[in-house]
Amino acid sequence: SVVKSEDFTLPAYVDRRDYPLPDVAHVKHLSASQKALKEKEKASWSSLSMDEKVELYRIKFKESFAEMNRRSNEWKTVVGTAMFFIGITALVIMWEKLY
């Protein structure tokens, strides 16, 4: 089987708060329903339902600003790892003092 690599000469999609409008859309290959929705988008937006507007947004963007600004739990991993190594160091020091 042949592995197809991505063409890195083309612009890539990225969610960033400091660069809010990426060069390309999040969804590159539209399904039939998404294509129909994109055609419906060309008409009046007042005829679109809220769910259709959200779906159009999700075609263009992966995350909203609220989702990008959401806190992560990465700090728990960092603190846990630091405490683990502090504990190992304490055990080594206690072992050295004992022997």
From Swiss-Prot:
Q: Which residues carry this modification: Phosphoserine?
A: S31, S33
Name of the coding gene: COX4I1
Is-annotated flag, keyword Transferase?
no
Q: Which GO terms describe its biological process?
A: mitochondrial electron transport, cytochrome c to oxygen
Give the modified residues of type N6-succinyllysine.
Answer: K4, K35
Function as written in the Swiss-Prot or TrEMBL entry: Component of the cytochrome c oxidase, the last enzyme in the mitochondrial electron transport chain which drives oxidative phosphorylation. The respiratory chain contains 3 multisubunit complexes succinate dehydrogenase (complex II, CII), ubiquinol-cytochrome c oxidoreductase (cytochrome b-c1 complex, complex III, CIII) and cytochrome c oxidase (complex IV, CIV), that cooperate to transfer electrons derived from NADH and succinate to molecular oxygen, creating an electrochemical gradient over the inner membrane that drives transmembrane transport and the ATP synthase.
The record's Gene Ontology cellular component field reads: mitochondrial inner membrane; respiratory chain complex IV
What metabolic or biological pathway is this protein involved in? Energy metabolism; oxidative phosphorylation
Q: How does it assemble?
A: Component of the cytochrome c oxidase (complex IV, CIV), a multisubunit enzyme composed of 14 subunits. The complex is composed of a catalytic core of 3 subunits MT-CO1, MT-CO2 and MT-CO3, encoded in the mitochondrial DNA, and 11 supernumerary subunits COX4I, COX5A, COX5B, COX6A, COX6B, COX6C, COX7A, COX7B, COX7C, COX8 and NDUFA4, which are encoded in the nuclear genome.
Q: In which compartments does the protein localize? A: Mitochondrion inner membrane
Official protein name in the record: Cytochrome c oxidase subunit 4 isoform 1, mitochondrial
Keyword Oxidoreductase listed? The answer is no
